Amino acid sequence: MKDNYRWLAPVYTPLSRMVFGNQLHEANTCFLSNIPNKKVLILGGGDGWDYRGFQDNLTGKFVELSPSMLSKAEKNLKDSKLHFVIGPFDFKEKYDVILLPFVLDTFNDQDLEIFFSKVKDSLNSGGKVILADFFPSQNWRQELMIKTIISGFRMLAGHVRQDLPDYEYFFRSIGMEKVEEKIWKKGWIKAQIWK
């Protein structure tokens, strides 16, 4: 499998913190205090750095397409009870919580439709999805930054999107409802719980 993040893995978290401070970390983790004793699925969790403070509560799977990122995640989350998996996820098990940390903007809309139907089928009764991602920009600076980020990931990591998906449309299309939301940068960065 080609490792599109090989060059990004060593600098991903430091670069993120340099540009956004602690805001992406906060978005990724703001709802995690509610998941003890839950079976979780983390899809595209990168180097796992954000989840280190919660690893005692993490049981389930951590799925990542990049071998470089997965290797870092295994080290960063060595005390968790997560099973680390490289490659596309097969959605054969059921989970209480599915985490989607800044990953959905790597899919085109057709793939998102398929992906979301599988997400819904992978949730236990009463299960929830926690999304953290960028949303439509609120000013020209954010617009310029998101275009730069998207272009950079297209060039360096082979992402296919040229814009941000309409996440809420896809959640609603599978009958899910947003039950909680936290925002940063006037709503440009959001964390949401969907059930």
PLM feature segments, named:
Residues 1-23:
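Class I SAM-dependent methyltransferase Rossmann-like catalytic core
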Residues 20-37, 49:
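Conserved alpha-helix/loop element of class I SAM-dependent methyltransferases that forms part
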Residues 41-90:
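Class I SAM-dependent methyltransferase SAM/SAH-binding core
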Residues 99:
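A conserved beta-strand element that flanks and buttresses the S-adenosyl-L-methionine
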Residues 105-107, 111:
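A short His-aromatic
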Residues 113-125:
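A short glycine-rich, Lys/Arg-flanked "PGG" loop and its adjoining helix->strand segment in the class I
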Residues 191-195:
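C-terminal lobe and adjacent flexible extensions of AdoMet/dcAdoMet transferase-like proteins
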